[in-house]
Amino acid sequence: VLFRSNNCLILKTMKTHLIAIFCLVSISLMGQKTYAPAWESLDTRPVLSWFENAKFGIFIHWGLYSVPMWSPKGTYSEWYKYWLDRKTLLGNGDFTGTEVYDYHKKMYGEDFTYADFAPMFKAMSYDANEWADLFKRAGAKYIVLTTKHHEGFALWPSKEASKSYGRPWNSMEIGAHRDLVGEYVNALRKTDLKVGCYFSLREWDNPLYNRETMDLFYERHFFPQLKDLVNNYKPDLIWADGPDSMNDKIWQVERTLSWLYSESPVKDSIVVNDRWANNTGRNMGIIIPENIAIQIVHIISLGRSVVA
């Protein structure tokens, strides 16, 4: 375009610069989006496109329960400690309840406790790079690893784990003496696979884990431990599990998600599932199929439409 005077040229140049500045400011403000610790605000956060397009993921259960590696068909072997200590058993089948206890006593002796498996969990054959290569060749888009299951044993150097249980209770201090989560994350980051971290809410034998002391459990253990995991490994996905029969107020879910979405180092990229409390299924980006079934039964029991 030709201009008849310098004034026109200057005006056009200024307009271009103003547009550029406006775009930069807009982008900056988008990056500064924060979410208040309230569902009205948290619910406005969209599901990130990477997860909507990731149709195939791989879920890995791996921990101390991998040492005995046994439970009757139709039951969860990762619940070995619970079955052992409570002498009960739930699942698909007819059980007396003492199957795991009887097996454990026969294999390891009556005085051998679940904690005695910790020195045996050495992960000698673990090669995270081999895992990543296998997952990539399988066509997976994201992976989820159990960084901590319901017995509280952590696969990274979590000081909260050992402090709460009064003994070495993470893979750096006992057993493998390795940061298993760190190796997993580093291997996946060499590929385009998304990093998922399973994080258990419940901890069967944590001294603070009961309804009367949930505030202390949250402040002293749960929240600082979650922050440690997120700050150190910056996962793309947090898979929460095990809220038991406690709601979002007890678990302080709004506070947790507000931090994840607004302050954490992954605030613009993190995806979460729907198991942060017993009533958060319809507030999250991911709704797990078995949770949908529970919600449908609840809706029908109230005489409402399945389509809310």
Indicate where each model-derived feature is located.
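Intrinsic-disorder/low-complexity regions
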Residues: 5-6, 273
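Intrinsic disorder/low-complexity segments
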Residues: 2-5, 23-25
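Short, small-residue-biased leader/transition segments that mark boundaries at the very start
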Residues: 1-2, 31
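Alpha-helical and His/Cys-centered functional microenvironments
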Residues: 11, 21, 65
